[in-house]
């Protein structure tokens, strides 16, 4: 995790997990040579197109790419997270919240169930938002995500979190360009967080 449990401190150096994850990415390029130079310059659609053409074996993509891959005839699958001692991945999330003062909680719960049903989500994601519907009664490929959701984390809600996340992203980019070591990328992010905190 980027922050400690109560969101008051950047926890990237509290154990070796962040450096190990950064080292894994770094080694893919600099030790094993499986990430070509141009890989860092590719944007989302270019990555997806290269994947469709068979030039990329594994890629991290946004959720809407699933529909594009299927439409292109690609037999694809996904894993929610790589795994070492533990596993985790960041996910985007929205929430439908029932007010505790609601006078008709049963009606509110029924509305939430209706809105999140596969039928409504399919319509929502074809007519309003171009992301594939991912609900518990949707594509079998997403079943594991709903059965074992403890490894899914939303972005941290903490003071200055956006600035820290942006700095981490930039430091990891510098690392992948060879300007920082994995240890420096993580430590520089922690130092920045402490300077604004």
Map each language-model feature to its residues.
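Conserved C-terminal helix/tail region of periplasmic/extracytoplasmic solute-binding proteins
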Residues: 30, 147-197
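Short, Asp-centered acidic motifs that coordinate Mg2+ and/or phosphate
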Residues: 53, 57-58
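Soluble non-cytosolic domains of exported or imported proteins
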Residues: 12-19, 45, 102-106, 158-166, ...
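Acidic/polar loop patches that form or flank catalytic/metal-binding clefts of enzymes
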Residues: 3, 34-38, 59, 77, ...
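Short helix-initiation/N-cap motifs at beta->coil->alpha
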Residues: 37-52
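Glycine-centered hinge/linker elements that transmit conformational signals in sensory
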Residues: 7-39
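Extracytoplasmic/secreted envelope proteins and their assembly/folding machinery
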Residues: 19-22, 26, 48, 52, ...
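C-terminal lobe and pocket-closing loops
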Residues: 59, 63-75, 84-170
């Amino acid at each position: 995790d980027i922050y400690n449990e109560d969101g008051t401190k950047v926890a990237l150096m509290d154990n070796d997990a962040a450096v190990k994850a950064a080292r894994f990415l770094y080694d893919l390029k600099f030790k094993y040579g499986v990430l070509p130079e141009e890989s860092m310059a590719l944007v989302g659609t270019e990555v997806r197109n290269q994947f469709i053409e068979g030039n990329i074996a594994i890629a991290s993509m946004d959720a809407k790419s699933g529909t594009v891959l299927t439409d292109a005839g690609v037999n694809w699958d996904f894993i929610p997270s790589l795994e070492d001692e533990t596993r985790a991945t960041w996910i985007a999330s929205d929430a439908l919240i029932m007010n505790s003062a609601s006078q008709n909680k049963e009606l509110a719960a029924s509305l939430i169930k209706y809105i999140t049903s596969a039928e409504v989500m399919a319509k929502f994601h074809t007519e309003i938002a171009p992301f594939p519907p991912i609900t518990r009664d949707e594509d079998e490929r997403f079943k594991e995500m709903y059965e074992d959701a403890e490894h899914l984390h939303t972005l941290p809600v903490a003071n200055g979190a956006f600035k820290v996340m942006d700095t981490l992203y930039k430091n990891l980019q510098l690392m992948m360009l060879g300007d920082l070591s994995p240890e420096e990328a993580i430590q520089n992010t922690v130092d920045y967080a402490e300077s604004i905190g």
